[in-house]
C-alpha cells in the first residue's frame, strides 16, 4: 500500500471541531477566527462555510460549544491577540468592535488605513502592538499612522501583551476607551 493510503487526515474545520471538548471557549474562538482570518493566503474557509459545516455536522461531543464559539467568532481577524482583545472588549461592555476596519484618509486622499479594532461610530480604535511593531521602521510607520488617525478625528489606543497579561491593565485601557467613546457621544 502507498503511504497516502495508510494516512488519513481531516479538514481544518473538522479538526477545530474535534478539539472543542479539550479546550476552553476562548481558545476555540481563536481557532475559528484563524480559520476565517483576513489574510487570503492563510484563510482556510469563510465564516459562512464554517457555520454551514458546524450546522450540518451530526451531533458530536463539543457541538454545542462549537455553536457558541461560532457566535463569538468574527471573520477577518489577523491574530489571536486581536481575538482576545475583541472578546475582552465585549466582556467589558464596550460597543461591538469591528475587526480590521478600514478608515478612509479623505484629508490626504491617500487610500485607507486598517486598524485592528474599531468603534467607527464613536471614532475610537485600538491597535495591538506585538514585537513586530518595535523595529525602527515599523515604529515610525505606526507613529505616522496614529497621527493621521488623530487628524481624521479618531482617538487611537494601543494595547500590548502586557495589557492582555494583566486584568488590571486591560481594565484601565478599556476604561480609557469607554471614556473616549462617551466623550464622542455626549
What positions do the PLM features span?
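Short gly/ser-rich loop at a beta-strand->alpha-helix junction or flexible surface loop bordering the NTP-binding
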Residues: 1-61, 183-186
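Surface segments flanking catalytic/ligand-binding clefts of nucleic-acid enzymes
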Residues: 39-186
Amino acid at each position: 500500500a502507498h503511504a497516502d493510503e495508510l494516512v488519513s487526515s481531516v479538514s481544518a474545520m473538522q479538526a477545530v471541531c474535534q478539539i472543542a471538548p479539550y479546550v476552553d471557549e476562548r481558545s476555540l474562538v481563536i481557532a475559528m477566527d484563524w480559520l476565517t482570518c483576513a489574510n487570503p493566503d492563510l484563510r482556510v474557509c469563510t465564516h459562512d462555510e464554517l457555520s454551514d459545516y458546524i450546522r450540518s455536522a451530526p451531533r458530536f461531543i463539543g457541538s454545542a460549544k462549537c455553536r457558541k464559539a461560532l457566535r463569538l467568532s468574527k471573520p477577518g481577524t489577523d491574530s489571536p491577540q486581536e481575538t482576545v482583545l475583541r472578546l475582552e472588549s465585549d466582556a467589558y461592555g464596550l460597543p461591538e468592535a469591528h475587526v480590521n476596519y478600514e478608515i478612509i484618509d479623505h484629508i490626504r486622499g491617500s487610500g485607507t488605513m486598517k486598524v485592528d479594532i474599531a468603534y467607527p461610530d464613536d471614532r475610537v480604535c485600538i491597535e495591538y502592538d506585538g514585537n513586530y511593531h518595535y523595529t525602527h521602521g515599523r515604529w515610525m510607520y505606526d507613529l505616522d499612522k496614529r497621527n493621521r488617525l488623530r487628524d481624521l478625528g479618531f482617538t487611537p489606543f494601543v494595547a500590548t501583551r502586557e495589557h492582555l497579561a494583566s486584568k488590571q491593565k486591560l481594565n484601565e485601557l478599556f476604561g480609557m476607551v469607554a471614556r473616549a467613546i462617551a466623550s464622542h457621544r455626549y
